[in-house]
């Protein structure tokens, strides 16, 4: 019997895993809540493929251990592949898939909601209300329709975000090295990132973590932006030089910051730190600021998205096992390792 083994299955994923099992009774499905590491790779022994999801790196040692267990067909439940040692994967003959589209709306909605909350100074108002301070001033907000919203990256998520912000009445501009023909016809694109930085009141990032994009938000780019800019990062943590953003917040150049992804999030996000020593002073500082909204990489986290991530990953893995073309194969190109 064909067997698929899944790693790092969360409680919220179990209903959708069981739904897939029920629809594929001829497949043996087993799983663990543990991450895939060199030590846990042996759990997959006897399986034909594995389904995985983690921010932890898929190192050469991890991939070797998985191959030693007889498994080289690996399906990610997420989109990001920058944490895979591609050279080692290629050497070992791995076949890898991901889920590039699971719910653009989930992430775009989160980015739009958080941006609007920053503009309205909701966190400051909530803090006042909690203290029973019901005065209006000085917590006056800005309307979305009065902003120029700059969207960096016009893929699936970026386009949904654009439509949402236009629904509020904002003027939307965009930049992408790969222009969408329909958006180009409608005149959304500016000529350069510099142009977008200079024109936008709100800047939202929707691009991948590739070397050219690392720390694209830095001291130099922030200096080019309008005074009182709002920066939104619900994409990848390494797009933002966190220290540069803190300097921009301290100077008042940046009005507010939305951060769902963080360059040092591995080992910190998705853990309960209540009553314990918090391990990251910089992150703690951002969380405590009244004009910063931090969420722990949960922009994607809806029932709709989680179901798609589980079901699509298992479908991809089964196709790999059966020698069929998967819906979203990953090219084993060299990356950061």
Swiss-Prot record:
Membrane-traversing stretches: none
Record-linked SUPFAM superfamilies: Formate/glycerate dehydrogenase catalytic domain-like, NAD(P)-binding Rossmann-fold domains
Protein name: D-lactate dehydrogenase
Residues annotated for NAD(+) binding in this entry: 156-157, 176, 207-208, 213, 234-236, 260
EC number(s) reported in the record: 1.1.1.28
Active-site residues annotated for this sequence: 236, 265, 297
Quaternary structure annotation from Swiss-Prot or TrEMBL: Homodimer.
Enzyme class: oxidoreductase
Known catalytic reactions: (R)-lactate + NAD(+) = pyruvate + NADH + H(+)
PANTHER family attached to this UniProt entry: 2-HYDROXYACID DEHYDROGENASE HOMOLOG 1-RELATED (PTHR43026:SF1)
Stated family: Belongs to the D-isomer specific 2-hydroxyacid dehydrogenase family.
Entry-linked InterPro entries: D-isomer_2_OHA_DH_cat_dom, D-isomer_DH_CS, D-isomer_DH_CS1, D-isomer_DH_NAD-bd, NAD(P)-bd_dom_sf
Keywords: NAD, Oxidoreductase
PROSITE patterns: D_2_HYDROXYACID_DH_1, D_2_HYDROXYACID_DH_2, D_2_HYDROXYACID_DH_3
UniProt-recorded Gene Ontology molecular function terms: D-lactate dehydrogenase activity; NAD binding
